[in-house]
């Protein structure tokens, strides 16, 4: 039998350049019509079921080749006779999907060529191509479009590491200056160059937050906390009016930390035996209703500022700690006076970037935020609903008052601020929405918000006990009390996580206490929503010493970052401070990224069940780290004592401040 061939016919007007074909054989020919959309192949008469498709046929172009060599022709061919051999049949077989694939490629190629032709005509001012589907041959030439020069250009720097020289390549001058005084040794840079870059990237992001006036990942020791946070409001229970913090005081960590150990070598969890000297801390004694929890006008405990190269070089400054002896805290039997601050090394500080004018997009965003605030806030005059205003705090972002609610005589904390002076208004909206939507016994009670005469009033319950920070730095907590605090905190976190909210800033500063021992989460400015469509986040926010490794290394993270922070807070309750607080921030970030699970000083003083609780919550791999709900079932939490056991500790702090 003579092999069938393809005979080209008159070009089809289907716009694709595909030609219907006729397979000529001995006997009656069979015509195959290819429709315009090439999605259906319809023979003119019924054809028998084809045998199995031979996938080994050579792939070639559509036409101009024998049928046996082409895979892009029609697959169904009626031979009109049953006498043809199976080998001949296999030679005539093709795959319909190849026709569609070929057609799709032709369509994409044609569309791309038309697009390029149209854009070329547009940019050169010429008319549309007569063959283009985007124009007509009669179109008149268009006027040339003037293209402006780039605006707000940014220089992207690619930093590398040369293992032969042990030096970074392409590193900005600012980063080089910071690295010199960061405390990260040359050997550490060679071992983990990526961790060094991650720490630098976090620093740069923190600087950007500071320049924009937002709440930085490195909370700063300043009089301003532009981000409206629940802690700033409810912290009226632990605020006192003070003068503005001087700019020089912003250069040093505010949380007292012990003398750095002689060796910086890492060790496994609960393995270090370092002993540190301490001094008295009379300056940290609060008044009866005041704690040192940070606000707009009080130096934030735990919160190192975003340091410059000069201030980083002063990291050897000794930090003050309470002088009461405790088996858990790293201290010596004798106390010493703090050493004088060493003169910073002469390092040229990186010049601050020139401030840019606010873009119209930012102005539009502010308008949208203001409209949102008006829709979610009470428009009434709050001065008619609350009385007995007593100013208990002042800062650049607003004033904090204690007051009484008219009718109920309920004691509340109110923060008043001029919304037009807040640089990150969207953070305020975020926090208000979280607080209004989530009510739980372990979350600070949100009462109301007022937007009246361009001023925002946030009303929260009055937490007179202050923050957990004062308790852990001035008292020795038993394992039962630590278990109680962890249990209450985890219950609040579980509620947030079940509702798709990750807190991202769990630490003792953001755990508030009442005089009855109630334990509640606060400060929801860093909260983020995670739903089924977005199960992970990558933004580097939070406070570095409590930050999970996956955040520091800029990986995707989820709810379990809060579990890690809880584990760090548990160490804080044991030792009075989080790990690496005595290190400067850049080195602390490096250690978190490279060491992972931190160590504590006296592991032999902890029970095995507490040790296991710390190990579980501080598991480096987030996939193996338990969730908040799973950690709530840990045996350690069964040792929890009633929260009322914290009342004497809270009251002792207040009475000592009298």
From Swiss-Prot:
Span list, region Disordered: 1-21, 39-104, 126-147, 213-365
Modification Phosphoserine occurs at: 301, 303
PROSITE patterns: CRIB, PROTEIN_KINASE_ATP, PROTEIN_KINASE_DOM, PROTEIN_KINASE_ST
Domain CRIB per the UniProt entry, residue ranges: 147-160
Bias kind Low complexity: ranges: 129-140, 226-254, 262-272
Cell compartment(s), UniProt: Cytoplasm; Cytoplasm, Cytoskeleton, Spindle
Keywords for this protein: ATP-binding, Cytoplasm, Cytoskeleton, Kinase, Nucleotide-binding, Phosphoprotein, Serine/threonine-protein kinase, Transferase
Database matches in InterPro entries: CRIB_dom (IPR000095), CRIB_dom_sf (IPR036936), Kinase-like_dom_sf (IPR011009), PAK3-like (IPR051931), PAK_BD (IPR033923), Prot_kinase_dom (IPR000719), Protein_kinase_ATP_BS (IPR017441), Ser/Thr_kinase_AS (IPR008271)
Active-site residues, as the UniProt record annotates them: 505
Residue span, Protein kinase domain: 386-637
SUPFAM superfamilies the record matches: Protein kinase-like (PK-like), Wiscott-Aldrich syndrome protein, WASP, C-terminal domain
EC number(s) per entry: 2.7.11.1
SMART domains according to UniProt: PBD, S_TKc
Entry's family note: Belongs to the protein kinase superfamily. STE Ser/Thr protein kinase family. STE20 subfamily.
Protein name per UniProt: Serine/threonine-protein kinase shk1/pak1
Organism, as annotated: Schizosaccharomyces pombe (strain 972 / ATCC 24843) (Fission yeast)
């Amino acid at each position: 039998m003579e092999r069938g061939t393809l005979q080209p016919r008159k070009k089809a007007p289907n716009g694709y350049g595909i030609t219907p074909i006729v397979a000529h054989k001995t006997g009656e020919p069979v015509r195959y019509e290819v429709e315009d959309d090439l999605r259906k192949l319809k023979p003119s008469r019924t054809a028998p079921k084809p045998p199995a498709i031979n996938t080994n046929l050579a792939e070639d172009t559509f036409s101009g080749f024998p049928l046996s060599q082409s895979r892009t022709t029609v697959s169904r061919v009626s031979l009109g006779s049953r006498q043809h051999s199976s080998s001949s049949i296999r030679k005539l077989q093709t795959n319909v999907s190849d026709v569609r694939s070929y057609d799709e490629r032709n369509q994409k190629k044609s569309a791309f060529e038309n697009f390029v032709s149209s854009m070329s005509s547009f940019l050169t001012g010429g008319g549309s191509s007569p063959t283009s589907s985007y124009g007509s041959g009669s179109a008149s030439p268009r006027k040339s479009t003037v293209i402006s020069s780039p605006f707000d250009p940014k220089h992207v720097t690619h930093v590398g590491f040369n293992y032969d020289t042990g030096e970074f390549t392409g590193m900005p001058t600012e980063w080089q200056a910071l690295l010199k005084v960061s405390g990260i040794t040359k050997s550490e840079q060679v071992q983990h160059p990526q961790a060094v870059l991650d720490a630098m990237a976090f620093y740069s992001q923190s600087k950007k937050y500071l320049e924009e006036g937002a709440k930085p990942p490195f909370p700063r020791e300043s009089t301003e906390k532009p981000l409206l946070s629940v802690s700033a409001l409810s912290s009226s229970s632990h605020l006192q009016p003070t003068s503005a913090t001087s700019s020089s005081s912003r250069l040093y960590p505010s949380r007292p930390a012990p003398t750095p150990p002689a060796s910086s070598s890492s060790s496994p969890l609960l393995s270090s035996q370092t002993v540190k000297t301490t001094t008295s801390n009379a300056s940290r004694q609060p008044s009866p209703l005041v704690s040192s929890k940070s606000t707009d006008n009080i130096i934030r405990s735990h919160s190192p500022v975003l340091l410059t190269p000069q201030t980083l070089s002063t990291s050897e400054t000794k930090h003050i700690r309470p002088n009461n002896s405790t088996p858990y805290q790293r201290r010596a039997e004798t106390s010493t006076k703090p050493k004088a601050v060493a003169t910073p090394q002469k390092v040229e500080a990186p010049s601050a970037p020139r401030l840019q004018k606010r873009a119209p997009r930012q102005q539009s965003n502010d308008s949208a935020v203001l409209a949102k605030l008006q829709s979610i806030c009470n428009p009434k005059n709050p001065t008619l609903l609350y009385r007995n205003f007593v100013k208990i705090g002042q800062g650049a972002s607003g004033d904090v008052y204690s007051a009484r609610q008219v009718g109920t005589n309920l004691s509340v904390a109110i923060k008043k601020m001029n919304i037009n002076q807040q640089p990150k208004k969207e953070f305020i909206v975020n926090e208000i929405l979280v607080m209004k939507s989530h009510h739980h016994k372990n979350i600070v009670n949100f009462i109301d918000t007022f937007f009246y005469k361009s001023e925002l009033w946030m009303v929260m319950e009055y937490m007179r006990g202050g923050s957990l920070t004062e308790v852990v730095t001035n008292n020795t907590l038993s394992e039962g009390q630590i278990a109680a605090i962890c249990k209450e905190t985890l219950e609040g976190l579980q509620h947030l996580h079940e509702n798709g909210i990750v807190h991202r800033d769990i630490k003792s500063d953001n755990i508030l206490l009442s005089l009855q021992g109630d334990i509640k989460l606060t400060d929801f400015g860093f909260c983020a929503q995670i739903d089924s469509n977005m199960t992970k986040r990558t933004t580097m926010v939070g406070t570095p010493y409590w930050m999970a490794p996956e955040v520091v290394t800029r990986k995707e993270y989820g709810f379990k970052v809060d579990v890690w922070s809880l584990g760090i807070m548990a160490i804080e309750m044991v030792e009075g401070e989080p790990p690496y607080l005595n290190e400067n921030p850049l080195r602390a970030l490096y250690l978190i990224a490279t060491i992972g699970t931190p160590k504590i000083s006296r592991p032999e003083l902890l029970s095995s069940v507490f040790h296991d609780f710390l190990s579980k919550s501080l598991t480096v791999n987030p996939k193996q780290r338990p969730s908040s709900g799973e950690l709530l079932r840990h045996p350690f939490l069964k040792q929890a004592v009633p929260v009322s056991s914290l009342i004497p500790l809270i009251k002792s702090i207040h009475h000592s401040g009298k």
